[in-house]
Amino acid sequence: MKLLHERMMHSLARYPRQTAVVDEQDALSYEALELRIREFVAMLCALGVGQGQRILLWAHKSVDLVAVMQAALRLGVVYVPVDPLSPVSRLEKIAGDSQAVLVLCTAARLEELAGSALAQVRSVVLDDPASAGYWRNIDTGSSVVPTLAIQPDDLAYILYTSGSTGVPKGVALSHGNALAFVDWACERYCFQPGERFANHAPLHFDLSVLDIYCALNVGATVCLVPESIAFSPRLLTDFIRQHEISIWYSVPSVLMMMMQDGDLLSDIQDTLRVLLFAGEPFPVKHLRDLRAAYADVRLANLFGPTETNVCTAFEVGAIDPERVLPVPIGTAASGNQVWAQKPDGSRCAVGEEGELVVQGPTVMLGYFAKPAQEGPYKTGDMVRQRPDGNYEYLGRRDDMLKVRGNRIERGEVEAALLAHPQVSEAAVLVVGEGMNAQLWGVLVAHTRDALSLIDLKRHCAQRLPRYMIIDKVLCLDALPRNANGKVDRFALARQVEG
């Protein structure tokens, strides 16, 4: 079984009545999920969507969305999940880059689509039976499911990340890329039939790959955390209890929020067996508290960019009371090889700082519509190997930022700010850590008229997803620059923090 959808079908044969997926309103067994998948397969065939074509998923999490993903995989159709709260302008960029032939959306977004460059792209509504575009209103009587030859190296899905030119980049991932990680994770963490995974991460975020595909791989249940409670700490803790969650995977800032404001440390969730985190460093003082409160729970730090999924992992045991640095990112994972590399291409010795390089089965096919990824992937992450073999994360080599676990290309936010008619120059930086991290825009205006933060936020909301919208603004007469003419970001940080 070398294809993603074959794993769900294997679980169907073994555990047909086991609950497969749960959302706010529905719960489907593997049998019921299979029937729903077949309905969506018929729908896609009726619409003429064929192998290798791309479809956009611009809708909130639901059992139907999971079924659409599976249906697409069976037909060799490439699905592209998009933040359901993204402005239509971002969807236009992604649709243009991916050359999508279909948009699956909520009824509430139809009007925006009609007034956009996507008006000529077929749209299907997932959530409103009263809508003329509702998926079940499509005539599937004459649809024929083709016989297909799908290979492990075929493209399965595309995850769009922030792009340095202001245009999102599509990370193209194959069945084999995903399954190399899924198989490793299932074996490493001993996932079992009947366990219950919480899917906290949005479906356009690579953390969701573990939640969805590991669960369906082993005959477990994936419980979709509604977007409406994704940042409500007490409700998240309640979600764990109500759904008897055994596997939790999220960014550290969400866990810290639950610890500080959701009673996760005092209201012990005894169904938890595995706690996984990724996406940003976990401040050790908070991680130490979590480790102490959940002494019998398996706790691990997973690391890797979207381009490689998880390429290293570290098991968190007892934490030295004197430790102040974050725990390591660990050693190679998912069948990959990793090493630290110097600028001249030579490998670093133990203790030397270098760029993390990854080679192996989870490395992406490439960026969609760009040249294929050849050879090892340079992550842009600076690391150092310790004598015990574990790697420590030291920061980014380039201009990538992380805010509350979200990866943000500085240039995309700056490009959006510069599109404002009153902005002459723009620089972006992050101040603070974890849930306290804030994205600052430092601006130079064309005129002396004051720039309104509310106006800037509204302006950015038309161009960027919400996690990329600035939290604070500082206006200067000129941006500080160093001797070579580049913006002096150290001086910027001093001005913002001062």
From Swiss-Prot:
Signal peptide coordinates: none
Record EC number: 6.2.1.53
Pfam family of the protein (one): AMP-binding_C
Residue ranges of the TM segments: none
Keywords: Antibiotic biosynthesis, ATP-binding, Ligase, Nucleotide-binding
Gene Ontology process terms (BP): amino acid activation for nonribosomal peptide biosynthetic process; antibiotic biosynthetic process; secondary metabolite biosynthetic process
Domain of life: Bacteria
Gene3D superfamilies, per the entry: 3.30.300.30, N-terminal domain of ligase-like
Top-level class of the enzyme under EC nomenclature: ligase
Single GO molecular function: ATP binding
Entry's Gene Ontology cellular component terms: cytoplasm
Record's keyword annotation contains Cell division: no
Cited InterPro entries: AA_adenyl_dom (IPR010071), AMP-bd_C (IPR025110), AMP-bd_C_sf (IPR045851), AMP-binding (IPR020459), AMP-binding_CS (IPR020845), AMP-dep_synth/lig_dom (IPR000873), ANL_N_sf (IPR042099)
Catalytically driven reaction(s): holo-[peptidyl-carrier protein] + L-proline + ATP = L-prolyl-[peptidyl-carrier protein] + AMP + diphosphate
Membership in a protein family: Belongs to the ATP-dependent AMP-binding enzyme family.
PANTHER family (UniProt xref): FATTY ACID SYNTHASE, NONRIBOSOMAL PEPTIDE SYNTHETASE
Function, as annotated: Involved in the biosynthesis of pyoluteorin. Catalyzes the conversion of L-proline to L-prolyl-AMP and the transfer of the L-prolyl group to acyl carrier protein PltL.
Record-given protein name: L-proline--[L-prolyl-carrier protein] ligase
Source organism of the structure: Pseudomonas fluorescens (strain ATCC BAA-477 / NRRL B-23932 / Pf-5)
